[in-house]
Design a protein with these regions (language model features):
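Short gly/ser/thr-rich secondary-structure transition/capping motifs
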Residues: 26-34, 158-161
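Conserved beta-strand scaffold positions in the cores of enzyme catalytic domains, especially
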Residues: 33, 70, 91-93, 149, ...
Length: 219
């Protein structure tokens, strides 16, 4: 992984775990990564990815040579060690299934401060590896800020460490595909009224679903 100017914008703590995540991926879950050229060269953006495994956040984040922000369920902060680590990598706590407006506001503020964020529109890990319906929150955050959204599809993470597995299946390849960024003009529908954020969320999720398996992908 070549050093880039964006690496210098990482805090030392985040940079260490970024490199550690990348190394673990290369050693035990290495598949292929496509589409990293689709990251906007300047300004904030959202990465919206499917979610089938605990492996998804570190693997997706390790492919981006800048400090990203993530969501995590608030209950993880109950552990002092986890709280210390999550705070140091600037993770945003969210109350699952409660429409946590405070967390959404923190994401919007981060984007307005030129920070980029990794989101999982489905809200939680898939129970079977298949895509789930997107929650409207991702649409709200995208529409409120107008930032480009980079769709991401992760293949193989459910087989590597899906819901219900006690230990990872080391050696099972995980492949990541980033699609072209979606401009606000293609996901936002201001005339949709109360359905505006739902429409945006479903359009973003449709772009994730449209990313084919790597052997067929054209990025």
């Amino acid at each position: 992984m070549p050093l880039t100017p964006d690496h210098l914008k990482m805090t030392p703590f985040y940079g260490f775990f970024h490199y550690l995540s990348w190394t673990v991926y290369q050693m035990w879950f290495r598949g292929e990564v496509f589409g990293t050229e689709n990251f906007p060269m300047e300004g904030p953006f959202l990465i919206a990815s499917n979610h089938a495994s605990h492996l998804d956040p570190p693997i997706v984040g390790s492919q981006v040579a800048r400090q990203m922000r993530f969501f995590a369920r608030k209950s993880l902060w109950n552990s002092p060690i986890a709280r210390w680590w999550l705070d140091h990598v600037e993770t945003i706590p969210v109350e699952r299934d409660s429409g946590d407006i405070g967390a959404i506001k923190r994401v919007i503020q981060a984007l307005r401060e030129n920070r980029s964020v990794v989101l999982f529109p489905e809200g939680t890990r898939s129970p079977d590896g298949h895509l789930q319906k997107a929650k409207p929150g991702v649409g709200l955050m995208a529409c409120k800020t107008g930032v480009p959204v980079v769709p991401c599809r992760v293949y193989g993470s459910f087989a590597a460490f899906g819901k219900g597995m006690k230990i990872p299946n080391f050696g099972s390849p995980v492949t990541v595909v980033f699609g072209p960024p979606i401009p606000a003009s293609e996901y936002d529908e201001p005339t949709a009224g109360k359905a505006r954020y739902e429409v945006a969320a479903q359009r973003i999720m449709a772009r994730i679903a449209a990313i084919a398996e790597p052997r067929y992908a054209v990025i």
